[in-house]
């Protein structure tokens, strides 16, 4: 028995060593405080960051199956593995992004102009304004949170001609905001992060921070950067609630 056991142990050890390493689940991607794009892996509340090798990002978004990154010279399109699959020349400055229901790139906004992805090209939409957040609203329309003076309005417009289809004042919304794929508006109210759906129903989670910006981190996730270059948070949006987690960052 001893001889058989001794002979068996090295075989077991070899079998264990031969097993492939288990990779943590992918959550999405964020840009860190230095502008480098980091893949976010792990589980809620226990995130690990991995450098994608992409730097100088001024805006970034990820849907779970595709990514969009704006640098001061280009707009980059990424696949699910964070590999660049297309690039477009672009002026300096930040951008807003939106994806379709399948997670494919749909819209981009920068320098006062709205663009749509169509047939592998980036085409301008006949609309201009001070957009705060954008989303696709059906196959032929876009939803935009527009700043008008000290008010924010939610506008739905035609992608074909740029005509406004309907609009409404976003009562109680004044700061940075985001739009989810279902049209819900995300904003800060006092100490809470709020998700308000089309019926006016709200989900809240305590945050206690001033927000610089929201960006899409992954499917069902938003990145939230605290004002003044502060901490980075991940907001998980569930049908019945919200969860907020701090994301560890690599020291610059």
List the predicted regions and their residue ranges.
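Short loop/turn segments that connect beta-strands within beta-propeller blades
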Residues: 42-45, 79-83, 118-121, 157-161, ...
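A short beta-strand motif characteristic of beta-propeller blades
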Residues: 46-56, 83-89, 121-127, 163-170, ...
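Repeated scaffold domains used in trafficking and secretory/extracellular systems
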Residues: 19-20, 55-65, 90-103, 128-140, ...
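An edge-strand/N-cap motif at the start of beta-rich repeat modules
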Residues: 19-46
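Structural motif
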Residues: 36-38, 74-79, 112-118, 149-156, ...
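Bacterial N-terminal signal peptides
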Residues: 6-15
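Blade-level signature of beta-propeller repeat domains, shared across WD40, Kelch, NHL, RCC1
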Residues: 225-252
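Short beta-strand elements that form the blades of beta-propeller/WD-repeat-like
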Residues: 25-32, 64-71, 103-109, 140-147, ...
């Amino acid at each position: 028995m001893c001889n058989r056991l001794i002979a068996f142990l090295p075989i077991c050890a070899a079998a264990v060593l031969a097993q492939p390493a288990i990779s943590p689940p992918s959550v999405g991607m964020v840009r860190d405080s230095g502008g480098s794009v980091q893949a976010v892996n792990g589980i809620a509340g226990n995130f690990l960051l991995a450098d994608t090798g992409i730097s100088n990002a001024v805006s970034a978004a990820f849907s779970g199956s595709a990514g969009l990154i704006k640098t001061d010279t280009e707009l980059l399109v990424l696949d699910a593995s964070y590999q660049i699959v297309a690039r477009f020349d672009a002026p300096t400055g930040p951008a807003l992004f939106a994806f379709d229901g399948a997670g494919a790139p749909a819209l981009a906004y920068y320098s006062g102009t709205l663009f749509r992805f169509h047939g592998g090209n980036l085409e301008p939409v006949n609309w201009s304004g001070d957009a705060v957040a954008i989303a696709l609203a059906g196959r032929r329309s876009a939803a935009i949170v527009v700043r008008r003076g000290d008010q924010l309005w939610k506008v739905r417009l035609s992608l074909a001609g740029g005509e406004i289809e309907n609009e409404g004042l976003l009562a109680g919304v004044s700061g940075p905001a985001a739009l989810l794929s279902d049209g819900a508006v995300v904003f800060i109210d006092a100490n809470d992060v709020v998700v308000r759906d089309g019926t006016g129903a709200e989900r809240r989670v305590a945050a206690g921070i001033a927000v610089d910006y929201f960006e899409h981190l992954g499917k069902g996730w938003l990145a939230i950067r605290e004002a003044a270059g502060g901490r980075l948070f991940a907001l998980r949006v569930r049908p019945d609630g919200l969860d907020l987690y701090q994301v560890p960052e690599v020291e610059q």
